[in-house]
UniProtKB/Swiss-Prot annotation:
Its main location: membrane. This is ADP,ATP carrier protein 1. Belongs to the ADP/ATP translocase tlc family. GO terms for molecular function: ATP binding; ATP:ADP antiporter activity. The keyword Transport applies. Residues 509-520 have a biased composition (Low complexity). It comes from Chlamydia muridarum (strain MoPn / Nigg). It is a multi-pass membrane protein. NCBIfam families: AAA (TIGR00769). Pfam families: TLC. GO terms for cellular component: plasma membrane. InterPro entries: ADP_ATP_car_bac_type (IPR004667), MFS_trans_sf (IPR036259).
């Protein structure tokens, strides 16, 4: 295999750009792919929320129903189809086959589906159901009433898990050597946050086009047209980069040698039952899974309440979308800052436990302030008057800050400590444990919060009525999160110490074996001399 002489990087370059010139051929298209996938993810995430929350007869209460009854089953169906296609198609054909449904649906949505929504949506049937069923089922009825918007929501959710987690990272892990991954992957993370900095203003610009439109033109329809046009252009770049990688990079022995990469252990495919069984047998893995589940549930509990406040403040879809674009931009700014200057330093200075506790403490503090403002807004008149705003707008801004701080600490600290927790484990635990957590924790994190909210909605009837109970549920889950992190830290330190002891013994044994050989060689050398 051809090797290129590589000089060590200086301190500044190793921090900012640890890439050799000849590696740009591989890094830049991968960086661009990840940037475009993340750019599309932000556009779809903000647009799906705007569509559902501001739709006629709908609101944030529809989101838990969509996530549990549509997103989770759709993800299962997709994985079954994907498994079947992976046995039939080549890797390149499979990538394009997975990308194509997204391109087709999101191209048709602004051109055909949205303009004819009045024909496609069963408004009369939904009105009949609403008259019969209790108010707690409003979210379920809204899901049926605006089923094309719900389909948009499902495809948008799948984009993140399919294109980002499965297709991109699956491709990257397959073609990237471990020595490259240590340098490349951090840059991809920066690319995702740079995508937030660009997609946020793009959403704001598209949403504010209404000011230049004439009478009789649907401003949100025009905004959708431009947003989906950006999405499709980005998809074209993704496909082009993937083609380039296969045509020019994977044929270059400097960057890709299948024989070398066969040594990488593939991730086992585990069923839900097998994953449960594996997690229950390992307290270490069970605690790690609890961290992931608790994060997913907590974010879900706060987000839906925040989005209901957001709808009351911005009932117009263009205004709602513009706010979400600004929110995405500031999420990117804060995430980049925290990742570069806070994340690694906290773990290096204060250790794993502190790094693992920052995110739940942040969610607890900011969540408490947010829920207090929502529940006791009538008692905060003095604070509201001093700030020169309204109770509703204050709740919206505090909710946005809560989301931004929670997600930025999650990206910089929670994800890092979660991955660090795998390091002291043996290879089987790393591979099987990660597979089990991906299957169980990821699904329960998303659907757990939705299940809690659905139960409370049916009983309480509305988001405002169930907010105090959501606050109690949030604090209870954070207590579980903090306890799990503390217990896992003890196991992590013990496993790390055992791993270091094992490595020290192996090193000592290797040196002991090498020393007699060195003694045998020395006389031979003296005799020759």
């Amino acid at each position: 295999m051809t090797q290129t002489a590589e000089k060590p990087f200086g301190k500044l370059r190793s921090f900012l750009w640890p890439i050799h010139m000849h590696e740009l051929k591989k890094v830049l298209p991968m960086f661009l792919m990840f940037f475009c996938i993340s750019f599309n993810y932000t556009i779809l995430r903000d647009t799906k929320d705007t569509l559902i929350v501001t739709a006629p007869g709908s609101g944030a209460e529809a989101i838990p129903f969509i996530k549990l009854w549509l997103v989770v089953p759709s993800a299962v169906v997709f994985m079954l189809i994907y498994a079947k296609l992976s046995n039939i198609l080549s890797k390149q054909a499979l990538f394009y086959a997975v990308l194509s449904p997204f391109v087709v649906f999101f191209a048709l949505f602004p051109l055909v589906i949205y303009p004819y929504r009045h024909i496609l949506h069963p408004t009369d049937f939904a009105d009949t159901l609403q008259a019969i069923l209790p108010s707690g089922f409003l979210g379920f009825i809204a899901m049926l009433r605006n089923w094309t918007f719900a389909a948009f929501y499902v495809l948008s959710e799948l984009w993140g898990s399919v294109m980002l987690s499965l297709m991109f990272w699956g491709f990257a892990n397959e073609i990237t050597k471990i020595s490259e991954a240590k340098r490349f992957y951090a840059l991809f993370g920066v690319g995702a946050n740079v995508a937030l900095l660009i997609s946020g203003p793009a959403i704001v610009w598209s949403s504010k086009l209404r000011a230049s439109l004439g009478e009789g033109v649907d401003p949100w329809g025009v905004t959708l047209y431009f947003l989906m046009a950006m999405f499709l252009c980005s998809c074209a770049i993704i496909a082009a980069c993937y083609w380039w990688m296969n045509r020019y990079v994977l044929t270059d022995p400097r960057f890709y040698n299948p024989a070398e990469l066969k040594a990488k252990k593939s991730k086992p495919k585990m069923s839900m039952g097998e994953s449960f069984s594996y997690l229950l047998r390992s307290p270490y893995m069970l605690l790690l899974a609890l961290l992931v589940i608790c994060y997913g549930v907590c974010i879900n509990l706060v987000e839906v309440t925040w989005k209901s406040q957001l709808k009351m403040q911005f009932p117009n879809p263009n205004e709602y979308s513009a706010f979400m674009g600004t929110f995405s931009f500031w999420t990117g700014v804060v995430s980049v800052f925290v990742m570069l200057f806070i994340g690694g330093n906290v773990i290096r200075r204060f250790g794993w436990l502190t790094g693992a506790l920052v995110t739940p403490v942040m969610v607890l503090v900011t969540g408490a302030i947010f829920f207090a403002l929502v529940i006791f807004r009538d008692h905060a008149t003095g604070l509201v008057a001093a700030l020169g705003t309204t109770p509703l707008m204050l709740a919206v801004v505090v909710g946005a800050v809560q989301n931004i701080l929670s997600k930025s600490t999650k990206y910089a600290l929670f994800d890092a400590t979660k991955e660090m927790a795998y390091i002291p484990l043996d290879q089987e635990q790393k591979v099987k444990g990660k597979a089990a957590i991906d299957v169980v924790a990821a699904r329960f994190g998303k659907s757990g919060g939705s299940l809690i909210q659905q139960g409370l909605l049916v009983v309480c009837g509305s988001i405002s009525a169930m907010t105090p109970f959501l606050a109690v549920a949030l604090f209870a889950i954070i207590m579980v999160w903090l306890t799990s992190a503390t217990k896992l830290n003890k196991l992590f330190l013990a496993a790390s110490a055992a791993k270091e002891q094992e490595l020290a013994e192996a090193t000592a044994a290797a040196e002991k074996e090498a020393s007699p050989a060195a003694k045998e060689v020395s006389p031979a050398i003296e005799g020759v001399s």
